[in-house]
Amino acid sequence: MIKKIFFSMFFLIFLAGTSFAAGSSDSSSKETLYDKAVQQIKMAKKLEKKGKTEKAIKRYERAIKFLVKSNKMKPNKADTLNYLGFATRKTGDFENGEKYYLQGLAIEPNHIGINEYLGELYVATNRMNLAKERLSVLEGCNCEEYNQLKGVIDG
């Protein structure tokens, strides 16, 4: 009887130890960095809507730090590059924002978010022909990103 209890306890402790080890893998920390960045961006957007631009920029800067680390750990993910471009653009660094967007498009040319945000960057930098090219990529997607970019282009 004591052997059964001891064996059962040992078995439970062993399983608990392996389940904790499974939670410390590299992939979860990569996702966590990305998730933290996305949360920072969401908070920054809310602050922008309230007119709190300086606080929003600080959130975007935090997001960039998380995204750069995430991109180093797991490079060439279009979604990460999209958010890097977005957050960088929102801090006023259009040149590097564009670089991130173009890297993302090289990986996933029809990425809806990148095409919309890159189009917005082109409008902000007075390159309307390039913005219209991004809009044409989105034309058949039947998505809100098309309408948003079209609204920005139409002014």
State what each model feature region is.
Residues 24-32, 46, 130-155:
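Terminal, low-structured helical/coil segments at or just beyond the last alpha-helical repeat
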Residues 43, 49, 90, 124-125, ...:
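Register position in tetratricopeptide repeats
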Residues 73, 107, 138-141:
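Structural marker of alpha-solenoid helical repeat scaffolds
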Residues 77, 111, 143-146:
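Residue-level recognition of tetratricopeptide repeat
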